[in-house]
Every structure is written in structure tokens, then in C-alpha cells.
Regions:
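Active-site beta-strand->loop->alpha-helix modules in alpha/beta enzyme cores, enriched
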Residues: 290-365, 369-544, 580-584, 600-610
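Conserved phosphate- and dinucleotide-binding cores of soluble alpha/beta proteins
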Residues: 2-3, 20-25, 38, 87-95, ...
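Short Gly/Thr/Asp-enriched flexible loops that form oxyanion-binding sites at enzyme active sites
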Residues: 60-66, 158-171, 519-537
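Structural motif
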Residues: 48, 79, 146-147, 211, ...
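Glycine-rich phosphate-binding loop signature in dinucleotide/nucleotide-binding domains
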Residues: 40-45, 140-144, 503-510, 515
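A conserved mid-domain beta-alpha-beta active-site/ligand-binding segment of alpha/beta enzyme cores
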Residues: 558-608
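N-terminal glycine-/serine-/threonine-rich phosphate-binding loop
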Residues: 1-48, 66, 343-348, 352
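Short internal beta-strands
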Residues: 77-84, 249-254, 387-391
Length: 626
């Protein structure tokens, strides 16, 4: 087990470093790799690195490339072994891990081809066992792996060691978990195209590396990260086996660390600062833990949970309970744009000016409706000037089957009057031909991507219109990082920032709503937020910015914890039903578990458990300040 260095890490069974963001963590990790390479070179030996794929290591690989290009770090004597490969994919397949590594790292540094090792996704089935044994032997032949880089999947897997993998497992062929395949669906233009099997290093293979580093970014990884670091070692979470390794560490950004005890319940691992925010977090946690409304908490319950110091400040639980309850109660408002001519002292949003110009930014179509569809409708109905701006077209989420359906409808319609509709016939026929030529896994031609974007654009427009937004106030920016890229191959550039900045400068809004602040920085949502942040900071100090409030919502991600919420907008049963009807406008791609409204209902149930008024559902927001 890796050593812990402070009381704050008392619950952690793997040494964990928390960084402000993913680039900072990646830079620290890359600097250590540099030292390893130089140290092994000084010994006359080659550094042996175990590498991972997916979006998590992308910032790390970009930093290694920078070290090579700008600081002269050579990789010409480094040996690499990758964790895994999809079974059935050729090395030149657009989603093969061999191609991923070439595009993300190998093609940009001076690593020798003969020193690169990945499992072969096309080895015949009757040769898989020998191929896996040979892979193990190749690792042993170079003296083992000095440093193994790992990510962690939503099921807690490292490599493709899905739940149930043994601690002693070796390199092998195995079936992929349904959650893993769903997560990869957008990469393969639909879950049906995701390979069902992969060849992966085993947990035992991974644990033989001399050093292990697991990296995780974004709030969606927080819960599984905490289970791996603080929970028991279990085959249900293969990453938990790192706990028994003598030199394993985790590198996290703040969002990925959110469920760790030292982040979530800091008073249990050391002296708390007891700021107003931390006090609120502690009292709400205690109420939910004791399954009591806030106003019913007693002195003894504070003492039993290590929170006696709070009582020394407030005297009795009675006074503390009232203060925290009032703060939580005041987050609730049916007027997200501010209630005109009302005392706004205790309201989350100011009354004036009224009406407000409101800008809703959605990194991908549907983010806005999922995260705040009910709030959008309230803002419109209460007289505000609401603009919705989609940063990307969302075409990468659309399957070929949807494009075929639309192309066939267009073709059959145009064929009714072929003389007048020749261009439409040519376009539809071209789409169908493009899909046939590229097959299920090829890169989509620009024409096909345009059609898919139009499909998604139509759904987004229908959804926004159903919530009352004017057609003239629905914008599609089609940011270049998305139109010219693909998942895990996005690069934010000046043109993206300029486009977002132009919208801000044109509208000069009083309110902005957006998401992506807790997302993986390589994701569309993370990059969308980064584009906004850069555009905002480029205009820092403009008079309109001083009067603009930025509210953060959650899109596809899990909802805020109650202590994080600064504005809670309640929805009636009818309002929730109307929101869900808008969500269902997105017929080409919608995750089934987002169609029932349970996320918003659960937030309302949590507020109810804390003792506030009972609502059908609640949409939650936090304020962002630059």
C-alpha cells in the first residue's frame, strides 16, 4: 500500500494528488516521466512505459509532445507497451488504439517503431492465447514496465478489466461490459458498431509494473474514483487493486476528487475552516445522514459526527439549524431571471433590470434542454429576452441509420418530380453512396456530417421552440474544433474563442447559462466551457460584464449535491412533463435514462428531506465567477 503523508488522506488507500485542473496534473506527470527517462538513460538502460488510451491521457500525451518539441526530450530509446486493443479492428481502423496512439503521441515524437508494442486486434481466434502469452513474455524480456499509466472507466475498470476480473489475471481476450460499450458508442456512430471483445493486459500484469499512476478528470468520474481509492479491494472495481501496490498514485483534478472524504467531508480528517459554505455542506450532510430535516437536528448528533466545534461557534444546534435552513430555503426561486419590483435581498437573482437579456449556451444540442429546459420555459414566460446558442452541431452522435432514413425520404420525395428536384436527388443519392463506401467504421465525408448536423439542428430548434424561444433567437455556431475534429481529436483554437466572443459582444447579456465546468477537459462540454471562459476573459472589464451573472447547469452529468446549489428552480408536474416532451424532440440520439425526469425529481426529494417545501422536480444551478 502506498504511504499517506497527511491526516487529510486518512481514508485513502492509494496515495492521491489533487490538482487545480487536468493540464496541471498532466504537466506534473510528464515532468516525472522525463526524469525517469533521463535516469534510466544515465544507467545505460531504456525506460519502459505502459500506456493507456481514451480521453484521460490526452493532456498528458500533449505535454510529452511539448517536452520533445520545445525542451528536446528524446524518446529514441524508450520502450512502450499499451494496455489493450479492441478485438476485430485493424491497426488502421479509425477507432483502433494503435491508430489512436499514432495520432495522439507516437507520430509526434522520436520513438522507434520497433519499440512500440500493442496487442493485435486481428490475431485469429485460435491464436489469441499464444498471442497474449507472447505479449506477457515481451514485457518480461525487457525487464518489466517501469511506469504504467492508467485511466479508470465508469465501471472502475483499468485497461479493459471489467467487473469480475481477478487480481491475478493476465493478458487475455474478454467481453466488454454494456456500460463500457455505451460509453464508446459515440466514437463508433452507435452502440451496435462497438466491438464486443478486447484484448487487455490483466490486473496481475498491471500490478507487476514498478510504478503505477492512475489519472482521472471530471465530475463524472468522482464516485468511481472514490470507490477505487477509499473502498475495499474488490473484483467489482478492478482499479481498487492498486491499493495493495507499493508504489501506486492517483492524479486527479478537483472535479474528479469531489467524492473523496477529504474533499466531501473535510471535518472528518482534520481541523475544518468552517466557512459559511463548509458549514452549510456539513449541516446538510448531517441531516441526510440522520434522515432528518435540518430543523430537527440535535446537539448530540453534531457531537457524534465530529462536528462539536460548530456548536461552540453557534451555541446550540437550534441556532445553527435555523441559519443553514434559511440559506437552503433561499436558494429556491420560481423567478430565475429575478422577480420584478420585489425585495431581492435573499433571492438568488436580482430583480433589476427587468426584463433581462438571457443567453443559454449549449456545447451540444440537447445539453440545454436536459439541464434547464424547465428554466428556459420559465424565463420566456416571465418576459425575458432568451437566446439559445448551440456551440456545435452534434452530428458525431448521429448514427448512419438516421442519415439513411432522412436521405431516403428526401430521395423518394424528389423522385416524384425528378425534373425539378435533380439537385436533391443527387444529394440524397450521394449520401447513400457515401455511407455504403465508408462502411460502418470509416471516416464520414463532409457531406454526410452536414446532413447529420442538419438532423440534430432541426431537433434542437423544435425543442427550443416548444419551450417558447423565438426562432430568430436560436443560434448554431458550428465551432471549428468540432466540425474539423472527432472525439478525442478536438483542438480548441482562436477561431472557436472568437466565435463565442462575438456572441457575447453582440448580446451583452445580463444572464448567461452554460455547462461543462466539471466535464472531462477533452470532451465537447469541457472544450465548450473553455471556449466561453477564454472569450469572457478576453473581454474582462467591459461594462456589461459587471452586470452579467453566469449560472452553471449540468447537462448529461449527474446533478449537483444540495450544498453546491445556489439557485433551485422548482417544476410542477405539468412543467416537468413539458420539459420531457422537449427532450424527446431529440429522436436521433437520447440516452434512455434521461427521459424519465428522475434526476430532477431526486433533487426535489432531497430538498424535501431537508425540510423545505415539497416539489415535483427541481433544476439546480451554481454561480460562476471568473
Amino acid at each position: 500500500m502506498s504511504a499517506r503523508t497527511s491526516p487529510a488522506e486518512a481514508f485513502e488507500k492509494i496515495a492521491t494528488l489533487i490538482f487545480v485542473d487536468a493540464p496541471a496534473a498532466a504537466a506534473a506527470r510528464a515532468a516525472e516521466v522525463r526524469e525517469l527517462i533521463l535516469a534510466r538513460r544515465a544507467e545505460g538502460k531504456a525506460a519502459v512505459l505502459g500506456l493507456a488510451t481514451g480521453s484521460t491521457p490526452v493532456p498528458f500525451y500533449r505535454e510529452l509532445i511539448r517536452l520533445h518539441r520545445e525542451e528536446g526530450l528524446s524518446f529514441n530509446d524508450v520502450i512502450t507497451f499499451n494496455l489493450d486493443e479492441y478485438y476485430g479492428l485493424s491497426r488502421d481502423h479509425r477507432e483502433s488504439y494503435f491508430r489512436f496512439m499514432q495520432e495522439q503521441l507516437f507520430a509526434h515524437i522520436d520513438l522507434k517503431p520497433e519499440n512500440i508494442h500493442l496487442p493485435d486486434g486481428l490475431v485469429p481466434l485460435d491464436g489469441v492465447f499464444k498471442h497474449c502469452a507472447d505479449y506477457e513474455a515481451s514485457i518480461s524480456a525487457v525487464g518489466g514496465i517501469d511506469l504504467q499509466i492508467l485511466g479508470i472507466g465508469r465501471t472502475g475498470h483499468i485497461g479493459f478489466n471489467e467487473p469480475g476480473s481477478s487480481r491475478d489475471s493476465l493478458t487475455r481476450l474478454l467481453p466488454l461490459d454494456i456500460v463500457t460499450r455505451q460509453d464508446a458508442a459515440s466514437d463508433f456512430f452507435g452502440e451496435a458498431n462497438v466491438p464486443r471483445f478486447a484484448i487487455t493486459m490483466g490486473v496481475g500484469t498491471i500490478l507487476r509494473a514498478r510504478k503505477l499512476v492512475m489519472m482521472a478528470w471530471g465530475g463524472n468520474k468522482a464516485e468511481i474514483v472514490a470507490r477505487a481509492i477509499e473502498g475495499p479491494e474488490t473484483e467489482a472495481v478492478s482499479a481498487s487493486f492498486l491499493q495493495s501496490h507499493p508504489d501506486a498514485r492517483c492524479f486527479l483534478d478537483r472535479a474528479a476528487s469531489a467524492a473523496l472524504t477529504r474533499t466531501r467531508l473535510p471535518w472528518l480528517v482534520g481541523r475544518a475552516e468552517w466557512t459559511p459554505a463548509e458549514t452549510r455542506r456539513a449541516v446538510l450532510w448531517l441531516a441526510l445522514t440522520e434522515k432528518k430535516p435540518v430543523l430537527k437536528l440535535r446537539d448530540g448528533e453534531y457531537n457524534e459526527h465530529g462536528m462539536a466545534e460548530l456548536l461552540t461557534r453557534y451555541g446550540k444546534a437550534y441556532h445553527l439549524n435555523i441559519e443553514v435552513f434559511n440559506r437552503q430555503q433561499h436558494t429556491i426561486t420560481g423567478w430565475p431571471g429575478g422577480k420584478p419590483n420585489a425585495d431581492d435581498t435573499s433571492r438568488p437573482e436580482r430583480a433589476a433590470p427587468f426584463p433581462k437579456t438571457v443567453l443559454v449556451l449549449a456545447p451540444e444540442p440537447q445539453d440545454d434542454v436536459l439541464g434547464m429546459g424547465g428554466t428556459v420555459e420559465r424565463l420566456v414566460n416571465q418576459g425575458h429576452d432568451v437566446h439559445v446558442c448551440y456551440l456545435t452541431g452534434g452530428d458525431l452522435r448521429i448514427t448512419d441509420a438516421e442519415a439513411i432514413r432522412f436521405a431516403r425520404v428526401l430521395l423518394e420525395t424528389a423522385e416524384q418530380e425528378p425534373a425539378r428536384w435533380k439537385e436533391q436527388i443527387d444529394f440524397a443519392s450521394g449520401i447513400l453512396n457515401d455511407i455504403e463506401i465508408k462502411g460502418p467504421f470509416g471516416d464520414p465525408p463532409a457531406r454526410l456530417r452536414r446532413l447529420k448536423a442538419l438532423i440534430r439542428r432541426g431537433e434542437a430548434r423544435d425543442a427550443a421552440l416548444s419551450l417558447g424561444v423565438k426562432a430568430s433567437q436560436i443560434r448554431f455556431l458550428d465551432l471549428p474544433f468540432y466540425t474539423g475534429g472527432r472525439y478525442r481529436q478536438f483542438h480548441l483554437g482562436p477561431a472557436d474563442i472568437t466565435a463565442v466572443g462575438s456572441v457575447l459582444a453582440t448580446l451583452r447579456p445580463h444572464q448567461i447559462y452554460l455547462t461543462g465546468h466539471l466535464a472531462d477537459p477533452s470532451s465537447v462540454q469541457g472544450l465548450g466551457f473553455a471556449a466561453f471562459k477564454a472569450a469572457w476573459e478576453a473581454r474582462d472589464g467591459q461594462p456589461w460584464q459587471e452586470h452579467c451573472r453566469v449560472w452553471l447547469y449540468r447537462g448529461h452529468q449527474s446533478e449537483y449535491e444540495p450544498h453546491e446549489i445556489q439557485m433551485a428552480v422548482p417544476l410542477s408536474p405539468d412543467q416537468l412533463a413539458h420539459k420531457l416532451a422537449a427532450v424527446r424532440k431529440f429522436q436521433s440520439h437520447t440516452l434512455p435514462d434521461l427521459l424519465d425526469g428522475n434526476r430532477n425529481r431526486q433533487t426535489a426529494r432531497t430538498y424535501d428531506a431537508l425540510g423545505t417545501a415539497e416539489y415535483e422536480a427541481i433544476e439546480a444551478f451554481r454561480r460562476w465567477q471568473s
